[in-house]
Curated annotation (Swiss-Prot):
It is found in: Cell inner membrane. It comes from Salmonella typhi. The gene is mdoH. This is Glucans biosynthesis glucosyltransferase H. Involved in the biosynthesis of osmoregulated periplasmic glucans (OPGs). It is an enzyme of class 2 (transferase). Belongs to the glycosyltransferase 2 family. OpgH subfamily. Residues 157-193, 535-567, 626-679 are periplasmic.
Length: 847
């Protein structure tokens, strides 16, 4: 069998069609497949003529509506995106310095901002009621939180051992040794630091407590006159004048999972009868060449299987500016003015058609709403860690989400996905300028969602949470270490966002959102400092010999004070603040029915196990978050890798590498406290033993075998597992199907496999007009690639080749036409295995 015969056998043709092809050489095969009989001056350009035929034989159902067009040079191109109609979207520079703004105002250089509210007086009056109610509620929250904090801090002050200055005689400190004076003052300095940290941390816990409490009352009553979901009946027909784009920005994700969830979502939309009102955009920032080819193949399969031609689009950016927010902005500039709304989906998002239609109805019923955020439910994972987190978010999450809505109303959060956005104001007001200056907190904004919500509200548009709208789902990281990788990115992003706290025009609620975003991570080093100071105070108390007689001829000693009854009361009240939200959550489930959670006893046991699990993990997260905060301030680089989204267990080696320092700290801490005062070790036990056990908990909780065992026992059961909605059932079904036909080593297959090469050539985006300089560059890229082994061809050079239709055609021709010359490539490809289910093509044979 010669090389031409081998090439013909690799084509997805019927036996009769293969027999009709010439066996003389590769070029003749491409000429025979070219229905237009084009001629090329270069022999290795001949594969460009057969692109259409190779595609039609491999994916006949994907090209039913004439997606193949001609580019400016007459080459076949697969039209994966509609024609762009550009809009202007540009950011205003940030003015983060209020002193500078005041100085400009004095000099008459104050510029009228673009974000001045566009609402009419009538529209402002219609919204004034809920805005007034929201303001009053937030003042009440502030008063409750501060009052609770003041009382608790006073209690804390009274139980500390060194009261007043009775143990120090200031006159004796004059002229005495500095070290002696320092040791006398040290307990008071430590106590002052402890009190300050306690006040900050207690205030943070108190705010969460009141949020959960109001959420509980809201859900228990079941009626919310200010819920945005109450503005529609739920069955109104969608306005045909408003189109909605479902956009999914992805970057090096699990291709099988992305397209499984997207297919399930689209089929659910079609089942509602509203598919004509939606289009889908897959916006890829992937830079792994193998994944890029797999995405192209998966897109072709998707549009064939759901008849999505002309409604499901795919684009891969060659210039990845500003990460996810830049990807969304790029969509808005090119195609945004064709749509009234867009729904942003994450790579693991799944949404039902009813939920998506409901979001559109809410937008149409509330013309002053700029963003409406759904409340996604976590599901779909099988590791013990993920199932425990799914249970926690499913049980506790509704309370906190409803509580957030109660306090914020239309000035709420946006979490970056599973939300609908009004496109026009987003284009006009939500472009993100880089933060000025230098260092780790300057440059492109990392956590864009909170900032975009703040900018939307600054322009007068409402930002709502539809907390009671069902049908929105997401997945959680499968293990602790993968969650912490995500937390590191979020930590850096939230610290950057705090630079916008004093930006002109921001609503006080969103200034508070920036503050709470920082406290989500800054509370960890504050808690660690609180524990460290408490330990230091205990060390001083244990090792320093107290002086009971400070005056000459003093008759009665001055004792350090200890108030155990107040200590117990403060400890009990703190535990109430921490754990009452969990109790309220389970009480709500008891009231409304426990069947979907495994029954009364199982859901109660699951809650107790989750509490134990959270106690074990809290100190571990504390230390990691402390490191994240410190590293952000020191300017250590943050790597933006996509999070792990499958059920992947943590190896023992990685666990001890990541948690080894925590284990050592826990051992030293425990031994030291046991030597000083065994009673104090009792209070520190939940902290130090959690650190000692951290590598073991991390590994065991990451295993899906343990998680599936709890699933069989109906522990950590959630309604989405008890009675899965159809959209999640379909996602699992399509995920299994996609994994059976997964394409690995996509770049090498795009070079050698005739069908995948035709796809890569047709979808290549670097379609420049012919020029001598360009030809020289193309020849250099191809020659350099083929003169090296494939293993030495780095990622960036592969992407350059993959982006150019001419280089892909020439690579394909040369490796097939001269296999002996490029033996390193041929041998490497022959060592790979093409999944037989990866390409189906035409199955009919000649009669």
């Amino acid at each position: 069998m010669n090389k031409t015969t081998e090439y013909i056998d690799a084509l997805l043709l019927s036996e009769r069609e293969k027999a009709a092809l010439p066996k003389t050489d590769i070029r003749a095969v491409h000429q025979a497949l070219d229905a237009e009989h084009r001629t090329y001056s270069r022999e290795d350009d001949s594969p460009q003529g057969s692109v259409k035929a190779r595609l039609e034989h491999a994916w006949p159902d994907s090209l039913a509506k004439g997606q193949l067009i001609k580019d400016d040079e007459g080459r076949d191109q697969l039209q994966a995106m509609p024609k762009a109609t550009r809009s202007s979207m540009f950011p205003d520079p940030w003015r983060t310095n209020p002193v500078g703004r005041f100085w400009d105002r004095l000099r008459g250089r104050d510029v009228t901002p673009r974000y001045v509210s566009r609402l009419t007086k009538e529209e402002q009056a219609s919204e004034q009621k809920w805005r007034t109610v929201g303001t009053i509620r937030r003042y009440i929250l502030l008063i409750l939180t501060l009052a609770q904090t003041v009382v608790a801090t006073w209690y804390m002050k009274t139980i500390l051992p060194y009261q007043g200055w009775a143990l120090i005689n200031p006159m004796d400190m004059v002229g005495q040794d500095i070290w002696v004076s320092f040791m006398q003052l040290l307990p008071y300095m430590l106590q002052t630091g402890i009190l300050i940290l306690f006040a900050v941390l207690f205030c943070w816990v108190s705010a969460g407590f009141w949020t959960a409490l109001m959420g509980f009352l809201q859900l228990l009553i079941g009626r919310d006159k200010y819920s945005i979901s109450a503005s529609t009946v739920g069955d109104e027909p969608l306005n045909p004048e408003h189109q909605t784009a479902l956009i999914m920005p992805i970057c090096n994700e699990d291709v099988s999972r992305v397209f499984a969830g997207l297919r399930a979502t689209w089929e659910s939309v079609k089942a509602t009868g509203n598919a004509a009102h939606f289009d889908v955009y897959i916006l890829s920032d992937s830079y792994n060449p193998d994944i890029c080819v797999a995405e192209q193949k998966a897109w072709m399969e998707l549009i064939a299987e759901v008849q999505g031609e002309g409604q499901i689009f795919y684009r891969r950016r060659r210039r990845r500016m500003k990460r996810k927010s830049g990807n969304i902005d790029d969509f808005c500039r090119r195609w945004g003015n064709q749509y009234s709304y867009m729904v942003v989906l994450d790579a693991d998002s799944v949404m039902s058609g009813e939920c998506l239609s409901g979001l559109v109805r809410l937008m149409e019923a509330n013309p002053n709403a700029g963003i409406i955020q759904s409340s996604p439910k976590a599901s779909g994972m099988d590791t013990l860690y993920a199932r425990c987190q799914q249970f926690a978010t499913r049980v506790y999450g509704p309370l906190f989400t409803a509580g957030l809505h109660f306090w914020q109303l239309g000035e709420s959060h946006y979490w970056g996905h599973n939300a609908i956005i009004r496109v026009k104001p987003f284009i006009e007001h939500c472009a993100l300028a880089p933060l000025p200056g230098e260092g780790s907190f300057a440059g492109s904004i990392l956590s864009h969602d909170f900032v975009e919500a703040a900018l939307m509200r600054r322009a007068g548009w409402g930002v709502w949470i539809a907390y009671d709208l069902p049908g929105s789902y997401e997945e959680l990281p499968p293990n602790l270490l993968d969650e912490l990788k995500r937390d590191r990115r979020w930590c850096h992003g939230n610290l950057m966002n705090f630079r916008l706290f004093l930006v002109k025009g921001m609503h006080p609620v969103h200034r508070a959102v920036f503050l709470t975003g920082v406290m989500s991570y800054l509370s960890a080093p504050l808690w660690f400092m609180f524990l460290a100071l408490s330990t230091a105070l205990q060390v001083v108390h244990a090792l320093t010999e107290p002086q009971y007689f400070l005056q000459p001829r003093q008759l009665f000693p001055v004792w350090p004070q200890w108030r155990p009854e107040l200590a117990i009361a403060l400890f009990a009240s703190t535990m109430v603040l921490l754990f009452l939200p969990k109790l309220l959550s389970i009480m709500l489930i008891w009231c409304k029915g426990t069947k979907e959670y495994g029954g009364f006893w199982r859901v109660t046991l699951s809650l107790l196990l989750e509490v134990l699990f959270s106690v074990l993990l809290a100190p571990v997260r504390m230390l990691f978050h402390t490191v994240f905060v410190v590293s952000a301030f020191l300017g250590w680089e943050v790597v933006w890798n996509s999070p792990q989204r499958d059920d992947d267990s943590t190896p023992w080696g990685e666990a001890f590498m990541r948690h080894g320092s925590q284990l050592l700290l826990g051992l030293v801490w425990a031994v030291g406290m046991a030597w000083l005062d065994l009673r104090f070790l009792f209070w520190l036990a939940p902290i130090v033993f959690s650190l000692i056990l951290s590598p073991f908990v991390s590994v065991i909780s990451s295993r899906s075998t343990v998680g599936l065992r709890t699933k069989r026992w109906k522990l950590f059961l959630i309604p989405e597992e008890y009675s899965p909605p159809q959209v999640l059932v379909d996602t699992d079904k399509y995920l299994e199907m996609n994994r059976r036909r997964i394409l690995d080593d996509g770049f090498m297959h795009a070079v050698f496999n005739p069908s995948l090469n035709a796809l890569a050539t047709a979808m290549a985006t670097a379609r420049h007009r012919a020029s001598k300089v360009l030809e020289i560059a193309r020849d250099r890229h191809v020659e350099q690639a083929l003169n090296e082994t494939p293993e030495k061809l780095n990622r960036d050079r592969r992407l350059v080749l993959l982006s150019d239709p001419v280089t892909m055609a020439r690579l394909h021709y040369r490796v097939w036409n001269a296999p002996e010359r490029y033996s390193s490539w041929v041998n490497h490809y022959q060592s790979l295995v093409l999944n037989p289910q990866a390409l189906q093509g035409r199955t009919s044979s000649a009669g």
